[in-house]
A protein has these predicted regions:
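Beta-sheet repeat architectures centered on beta-propellers
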Residues: 247-249, 260-269, 279-289, 300
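Acidic/polar, low-complexity linker and loop regions
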Residues: 55-73, 81-85, 125-142, 219, ...
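Juxtadomain low-complexity/linker regions and immediately adjacent membrane-anchoring helices
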Residues: 1-77, 94, 101-117, 123-125, ...
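Beta-sandwich interaction modules
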Residues: 85-89, 130-168, 239-241, 246, ...
Length: 358
């Protein structure tokens, strides 16, 4: 069994959440499959984005309203539980955040996390569960950060959070490395930056209004809240940027910058660079970055597509397609860097291409 460490918030960000993906989040497609009880507050709240909130004096027919999962008192079983299907095909796990915000006097005294790999939800009844995080104490109204000393050896499709014996938990984050399922044919185009391909944002200049990891998740989202947005800049020459480690080294054939829902706060223009680097997070000013998309104006609520000059045509879903892609046909890249000028919001960043090797 891997050793478990209790980390501070800053250490958890530095070691875990900035390097791995929350594989159960609702915005990624994580889904509650079943639970033992949710008398006071729904289990689905556990995997919602954003920090939990408190509305003092608000009641439901079951009792005081809580932004989290809360079970009834006096559980006759050792623990209450909830089973969650990952938002990716499967993943290995490195750590978790358990937030008991606003649960004080009714918080979960202890938790554990288990995982299993099944082909179908109907197989869960006979599934074999493996311990990921052992039974660990929790305190009232606080964020708890637990990390393994190594990724789990096995990938999991579902996880089970237990609370002993009952009570409330506001949020549950589970960080790990998605297990990408790549097509056998290396010439098949895939989104190398997508979270399901193993893409992850490893560095950024700012994420004041919206997190950079939103750039790589499925779909176009529902509002500005599920994109990447930086604060307003006040200095001449300012730019913001994000560096994405691709899920696999590959050739870049097509890039998409989607400004969906960003109407008065989209970037004036963008550039895209790429690099082949042995470093997990190469410096944003590394001289080896190569220009892939030169400075190009953007517009509000649009899918901007950038393709090679020799490409036959672009995607029918794009609002605007430009044949401006450079350095893309014969070079292998491991990372891509999106720069927005001078600041603003972008919903999604896609880097389509072909893997360099199996």
């Amino acid at each position: 069994m891997s050793a478990i460490s209790v980390l501070s918030h800053d250490d958890f960000v530095a070691q875990i959440s900035s390097k791995y993906t929350d594989v159960i989040g609702a915005k990624l497609g994580g889904k509650i499959i079943s639970f033992s009880d949710e008398w006071f507050a729904e289990a689905n709240n556990l995997i919602q984005p954003g920090l939990p909130i408190r509305q003092v004096g608000k009641f439901t027919p079951a009792g005081a309203w809580y932004d989290g999962w809360e079970t009834r008192r006096h559980n006759p079983e050792p623990a209450d539980w909830v089973i969650i299907k990952l938002g990716v095909a499967s993943a290995t796990i490195i750590g978790t955040e358990i937030d008991t915000a606003f649960f004080n006097g009714n918080h979960a005294p202890a938790i554990s996390v288990e995982g299993t790999f099944v082909a179908d939800d109907k197989d869960l009844d006979s599934a074999k569960w493996e311990e990921i995080i052992p039974k660990t104490e929790c305190g009232p109204s606080q964020r708890h950060f637990f990390a393994r000393d190594a990724l789990t050896e096995a990938p999991y499709t579902h996880v089970r959070l237990k609370q002993y014996p009952d009570g409330g938990i506001a949020r549950f984050r589970l960080y790990g490395k998605p297990t990408a399922v790549f097509p056998a044919d290396l010439n098949t185009e895939i989104d190398l930056a997508h979270v399901s391909s193993g893409g992850i944002a490893v560095a950024f200049s700012d994420q004041h209004f919206g997190a950079v990891d939103n750039l790589l998740i499925p779909g176009r989202g529902k509002d500005m809240g599920d994109g990447w947005e930086t604060k307003r800049s006040r200095e001449p020459g300012h730019v913001d940027w994000v560096i994405v480690k691709l899920g696999a080294p590959g050739y870049v054939d097509r890039v998409i910058v989607d400004t969906a829902n960003f109407m008065g706060n989209y970037p004036q223009s963008i550039t895209v660079h790429a690099i082949n680097s042995p470093d997990a997070d190469p410096a944003h000013d590394d001289p080896n970055w190569k220009l892939v998309v030169d400075r190009t104006k953007t517009g509000p609520h649009k899918i901007h597509e950038y393709i090679r000059a020799d490409a036959a045509s672009g995607s029918p879903d794009a609002d605007e397609t430009q044949k401006v892609l450079t350095s893309a046909n014969d070079e292998v890249f491991t990372h891509a860097k999106l720069t927005i000028i001078p600041d603003g919001g972008v919903k999604r960043f896609r880097v389509f291409g072909r893997r360099a090797s199996a």
